[in-house]
Structures are given as C-alpha cells and as structure tokens.
Amino acid sequence: MHAQDKGGILPALSLLLIAVAMVSPSQAAYKLQERYSWNQLDFAFPSARLKEQALASGDYIPTNALPVGVEHFGNRLFVTVPRWRDGIPATLTYINMDHSVTGSPELIPYPDWRANTAGDCANSITTAYRIKVDECGRLWVLDTGTVGIGNTTTNPCPYAINIFDLATDTRIRRYELPAADTNPNTFIANIAVDIGKSCDDAFAYFADELGYGLISYSWELNKSWRFSAHSYFFPDPLRGDFNVAGINFQWGEEGIFGMSLTPIRSDGYRTLYFSPLASHRQFAVSTRILRDETRTEDSYHDFVALDERGPNAHTTSRVMSDDGVELFNLIDQNAVGCWHSSMPYSPQSHGIVDRDDVGLVFPADIKIDENKNVWVLSDRMPVFLLSDLDYSDTNFRIYTAPLATLIENTVCDLRNNAYGPPNTVSIPKQAAPGHSAVGPPLYTTTNQYRPVLSQKPQTSWGPSLPSRNYLPALNGNPGIPGSRNNLNNLGAPGQVVSSVSVSTNTVGPSGIEVPKAYVFNQHNGLNYETSGPHLFPTLQPAPSQLGGGLKTYVNARQSGWWHHQQQG
C-alpha cells in the first residue's frame, strides 16, 4: 500500500480516529472465526538474549510491524510484514500451526533469518507484500526491494520474484524484473499465479499500482513483459475518497491493485479480473493475451470493462475458488464480499459474506486454500499509517472459515434456489468491432441489490464490544454463534452495508443517515434495481415521506433538505 499524509488528515485524527461503530451482537456476523490475534507482532528470535539485543539496537521495534499478507499451506500459515518503518527483523514469516493452534504466536522467519536480511539483494528478501502458493507446492514471493513507504521509500534492491519449493524449503528461482518492466513510479504489491497444463506452464502477473501497468512472467521462458498502455490500469478520479474506521483520507492515485483468476475455461485459458484501488469497477482480460509477449502494444480492445460493484466498494484483495466464487475485501465497509462468476457483474449479484466493525477493520488480504478454507487477515492499516494504533487493544487478526459456510444463504450460493437465477436469460456478450469479449454468456436474475442505512458511528472503539472466540469446529456446528443457525445476524443476500463516517453521510428528513456515495452515484447516472420499498425498509413506516423505497428516496434529492446538505 502506498500512503502518505494528505494535507490536513493528521491534525484531524484526534477527532476522526474514534471510529468504528460499536456493534451489538445482533449487528455482527460471525461466519469467520478468529484463529490468531495480536496487539503487536512478535518474532521467534533464536534466543532471548538476541531478542533483547535487537530491541536495544532498534533492529526490532514491535510497534513498527504491520502484517499485510497471508497464505496457507499444510501446517504453515505464512504472514508478510513489509519494511515500511525501521525495526522489522523479518518480512517473510510463518506460523507453525501444529505448535500454535490459536493465540498470539511468534512469527518465524521463512525460510530462515538470513533470507530476511534487508538489502542483501541476491540472497534475501527485503520487503514482501502479498504472496501465493500454487498447486505445485511452490511459494511465489515478490520482493519489492524497498524500505519505507510513500515519501520515505528507498530502493536498495530491484524488484525480484522468488520461488520456493515448500517440500524442501529452498529457493529454486530468483528473477529480477528488467528495467523495461518498471518505471520511476512503480509500486507492486499484488501477485496472481496462473498454472496451465503443467507446473512448467506457469505464469505470474504483477499489478503495478502507481506505475499503472500489468507485468507477465513466464516460468518456462524465465522472461517477463509489461502491458502499460491501458487506461483501465488507472484510478477513477471520482473514487479517490476513502472512509475506514472513521478516518477520511484520499488515495486518489492508486491504480491497478486487486487481481483474481478464474478456473481454466473451455479455450484452455483463464480470465484475469482486476480493479484499481481508487475505483469501484472491475475489468477483465484473457490470459491468452497476457501470456503472449507480442500483444503488449496491440491488446487495448481485448480488455473488458465491467459494471461498478456499488457504493463504498474499494477493494485491495480478491481471490477466486476453482468453482468460480470470487471473494474480495470491502475496506470501506469492514467486510468481505462475494460474487459468483457465472452471474452478471452487477451490484445485485454481489453479496456480503461477513462484516465486523471491530474485527474486520481493513481486511487486508484474503486467500482460499486447497481445502477450500478461507483465510482473512485484518490489520487496521489506515490507523497504523495515519496515526498510532492502541497497542493495549487487539489490532491484528487472522480469521478462517470454510468457503461453503461463508457463502451459504448469500447471492453467491447457487445451491440455494432462493438465490440462484430462477429465470435465467442468456445474454450473448456484446463487443464492438475489433473488440474481444471474455467468458461465457451472462444471465440476469431477479435478485435485488439492497444497500441499507447505517447508524451513526460511535466515538470510541468501546471495550465492551463483542469478540469472536476461536472455535475449532468450523463445519456448520449449530453451536457456532452467527453460523448456519443464526443467519439473522447476517446482512440480507446481496446487501452492502455502509460504514462511512458521520461526516460523509447524508441525513434524510427522518433523521436516518444514508451514505452520501450512494446518492452521488444515483445523481450521476449509476442505476440499480430499485423496484419495491424493501430496498430501504427503514423508510417504509413513513409512506407520506419516503415509504416508496429507493426510487422515492432518490427523488428526494430534489427537495430542500437534499440541496441544503449539498450546499452545507
């Protein structure tokens, strides 16, 4: 993540930090179960004496460490810690899950301490962000070679992909990105790995967030190339405003970031979905294009633009299962969302699988392992970057749950007739002359997109907030709070829950707060399914005012109260 003080944020933090809404048990969803948590990170030093020396010398500063990436393989859970500040002893680490079933375990450097030496370019990893384990038992780690963040960034080493054999814990390849694949603004934090017909038929794709490009790397050729001449890699100028944990900030320059890959399609290729961070929109391209070095300059029309996900829909991490379910973080909403790739990419086809205004503040990374278990890491990143975390509180959490449990009774669960496409209508993909269309025909459904109104956030974290207990039984145990037998705690299928701060909401005549972003999108022509008053159920009791649902509500922007809010 690239971040810096955006003039005026820091002076206001004493008022803004405050932050997330206090939630009662009836407001929190608990499909994801907490596995590990930390107030601050700790590392497994070889001895207590060496740890004390590192603390005394400043080589280890516990409050400077922030986890950003997670990946699971076998009995190990990998966690990455970028060197954004001084005192980070290791950037690529893991938890031995046999020794630490839960709790706040020490992070063990992977594969060892020497391989985590900052600045030892050829032999070590300086800074790692997101990582990926492939189906061949290899761990792919992109070393950015950077120390610091924003204006403090230095580049002691070049960008390099490191691949480890997890059976032997040895590095089997290191490949430096050539100068032609980067530019002075390059910042790469995300990686997607594409395995084709064999383990040698492997590609990795890197999203250049600030240099606005997409880089392909071929394992077989040991060669890379860059796609850079595409406007889809750039941020949306209307989507650079963020609200996380009550903090309003701007990341308006953040381009292509989150990526996911579909299962292999009938033509032998996958589809890569991606989205800029400062955007609510998703884009797609076939890996047939990305795997072809000759297409870097003439592939503009092979990229496809999809609809917006809906309001408050910034995302940094996404992953797709082998049966086509995409999960992604919704950082403005303290939530994890879903979309089934067999459905149209429209707001009404998106759902919320879990939301927690305390535990899921900035769910930084999401992964699905080979057993279809989902892993989510949350880290309160904006608070860490723009202010100071409260290290007497739990700041970092890793959650897990079976994928089937997460999507059950959501719009993404096609096994449930209530949420499947009861009357599917095949719609051939449309493409202008010379354009390519990606994927199979789409279909429409009668499901509705149901954003809901949010209550005012409180002004403290609140020590009495409910906490998730670690529960080892994750397969639909009736005793799990908020699981299969407590679905009333979950958002309605397809609904998107707003968690924006008070200062960014619009207040209607009933005194209920409505996300301003939703009004803004409607005002600027972004349409949703709006039939029926069920869309804004809290407005139904006053038919004379706004009881006609969202259409009536949106029409209210012509009234005096709406204009007053806009002028104020």
Swiss-Prot record:
This is Protein yellow. Residues 1-28 form the signal peptide. Belongs to the major royal jelly protein family. Coiled coil: none annotated. Changing residue 476 to S: In strain: 206RIB/AST. Glycans are attached at residues 151, 222. Changing residue 198 to N: In strain: 200RIB/A1, 238RIB/AST, 358RIB/A1, 340RIB/A1, 394RIB/A1 and 441RIB/A1. Controls the pigmentation pattern of the adult cuticle and larval mouth parts. GO terms for cellular component: extracellular region. It is found in: Secreted. It holds the Pfam family MRJP. Keywords: Developmental protein, Glycoprotein, Secreted, Signal. Changing residue 451 to S: In strain: 200RIB/A1, 201RIB/A1, 203RIB/A1, 233RIB/A1, 332RIB/A1, 340RIB/A1, 358RIB/A1, 394RIB/A1, 441RIB/A1 and 417RIB/A1.
